[in-house]
Amino acid sequence: MFDNLSDKLDKAFHILKGHGKITDVNVADTLKEVRRALLDADVNFKIAKDFTTRVRDKAIGENVLTTLQPGQLMVKIVKDELTELMGGETAGVNLSGNPTVILMSGLQGSGKTTFSGKLANYLKTKKNKKPLLVACDIYRPAAINQLHVVGGQIGVEVYSEEGNRNPVEIAQNAIKHAKANGFNVVIVDTAGRLAVDEEMMNEIANVHKAIQPQETLFVVDSMTGQDAVNTAKAFNDRLNFDGVVLTKLDGDTRGGAAITIKSVVDKPIKFVGTGEKMEAIDVFHPSRMAERILGMGDVVSLVERAQEQYDEEEARKLQKKIAKNEFGFDDFLTQIQQVKKMGNMKDLVGMIPGAGKALKDVEIEDDAFKHIEAIIYSMTPGERSKPTVLDAKRKNRIAKGSGTSVQQVNQLLKQFDQMSKMMKMMQGGAGKNLMRMMGGMKGMQG
């Protein structure tokens, strides 16, 4: 995520390395590279220019008051200014109303229908809501089918009316259905277009007027950069939406849309999509995003994701197994599956401070655990619980059954052995304290 921008900003800050203090000259040299990095990231020229002017003024002004090294001071100021540029504070979704009505809008291909499903899943699993998805795209039967498939995946009902060509009527009927059947959130997925046009604007304006949603979200593909920003501006001028959703952020190496959209439309980014899975949705935190752009990672989000997968009862069972030296491949597999639920691997690595930079040339596949799972699934229950029985003949059978090599099987056994030893060591105070801390923090979240 934003790898190109992160690299270029890092090189810009390098100019100040070895300098004892900030001067007009070294600030100008650094900010010239910062501005170039922002322009390469598809940030609007005026926004990039204004941004570097604010950073320069702060750097010169704060220099006499700080004990920070010039490079550290510049990183701090750029982080603070990036945070402000992207909205400053985290903006939550408005869940007032009974039911809460959320109107989804956006261009065709922006990921609007998929995100509608992700939002429904988020509200169901994280906010304890009972959402209803509504199919109002009367032009593309495939969009209605897609929403039904998405609803089936997450266990959320989808309301649609076959043969009805009036999206206003469909939306109004869906809200009546929601009230009659105990749904407390209605997510209305509207028709997308290939470009912003008058017909599309009129239609969604009519739907908006008829159902008076508590929240209107505009979904944009972050990988389209300035096009996304321009589209959002044209749409907001007509509809005056409440917030922006940036999809496909995991594939965006530049970051122009995320950085500039708030200052152009003066509406907050509320959510981001970071993968194809229904769980790949994050509330947008400007300060955390600024830290990730600057290669500082995002430990808070990483811990939050880990806590969501943390099961105190399972942790106790695992602790007992480790104490009795009964940790087996079934337990190892459970740990892998919990990590997978946290999100795609590249995104997780990017949350670890310094890891994104250190591993920038390493290809991190989303199915990084595929071979490990195949090897474990090719073992018998007895072999999984007692790996010491695995001789050459058994390893050969497992390799053939999993489509891997004996070398890969041996490599996994070595990793498993190392992990078992590490977990045994963690049975001491440090490990128990860590488990207690995770449980305590999860309790604090409620």
Question: For each predicted feature, which ranges?
Answer:
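Conserved phosphate-handling catalytic cores of large alpha/beta enzymes
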Residues: A171-I175, K179, F183, A195, ...
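Long amphipathic alpha-helical segments used for membrane anchoring, targeting, substrate engagement
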Residues: F2-H19, R288-G446
